[in-house]
Amino acid sequence: MEMAEIGKAPENGVSRPALSKEDGKARDLLTEWIKPFVDEMMVDEVGNMFFIKQGTKSDLPIVLSGSHLDTQLHGGRFDGVLGVLAVLEVLRTLHENQILLDHGFGLVNWSNEEEARFCPAMGSAVFSGKLSSEQVLDCRASDGSHYGTCLKQIGYAGNQLPSSLKVKAYLELHIEQGPVLENESLDIGVVTGAQGQMTMDVTLQGVAGHAGTVPMRLRADALACASEIISQCRSILLKKEDGVMTVGTMDVEPNSRSTIPSKVVFGMDIRSPHSESLEQLKNQFTEAISSISQKHHCTNNVEIRSFKPPTEFDDSCIEVIESAAKKLQYGYKRMPSGAFHDACMVKEIIPTGMIFTPCLNGVSHHPSEYASQEQLFKGVNTLLHSLSELCRK
């Protein structure tokens, strides 16, 4: 895997953050590989790369597919890069078999999908009109790096306007980044959209006291309160089939072994593929927080930090992918994505679909991220048949 050698990290990991020297080398290698199979290459103002193979009918819009080459720090070899190299393989197959399609066909490498350096999905956000080129080019990373300057340094500051392309549909192949397909012994995930997400911060205020002198029944223990709230919210979700919850941050005061916790702040991440379910969960969780706080003699404050509604992909793209999986006799299921992808941006302006392939133990953003050759073949083959169908319709 020559691409994985660029930014190679310990334990088979890859560190190739957006607009780094390693990202530039990966872009160079992709360009070298793909030149024999395309007619045109374009780079837009924020570094999105487009490689176009013309169709037999030049007046028709192109079909686009791709993903991203940048990675998390000490991330894996398959996240993003699979979707790019899969399209390279599709283009190679069409070229070697002299297959001509009515619609033109293009590969896109979206600039800066990961959140390893800059804010995520900036390239696809500009393409879809969610951000302006100026906003992205002026962005600074946590280390102070300037997006526009870094883009010039690696040689990928283009001048094509994102709106200059006419696109019929967009498909993206990606590892699932979760354990569902592997757990159900399936080959392909036909992605229906992405889960909505709500984040909230919960603050619980109790009363500090001596760990040895205050009886249990007289305590206002903020940490005990938080523990019961989290357990109750988990129980609520376990009765459902369409949501997940994670408590990933927690601050405890005074954080002393011999002092009853007086204050706890914890962050919740709640996701569901259905807007009404997210709203219902918010109400159920808020009610649980209130009642359990009273039980523990604590006060509470709930702050909704963000809300992203669920994403729904295009029905016609979903049907094309499902039809391809059926024809190839692959085991598949329709499923939502638990993570955000460039496709979630692109769907705002173009009919969009996604294909998932299983990954070992559902692990991603980690050096142990892995998908077998057989799994990758089935994913790429499904993409090939789906794209071919879209380019003929």
Which ranges hold each PLM region?
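Active-site-adjacent substrate-binding region
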Residues: 5, 9, 144-192, 230-235, ...
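Zn-dependent metallopeptidase/amidohydrolase metal-coordination segment
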Residues: 2-9, 66-67, 262, 332-382, ...
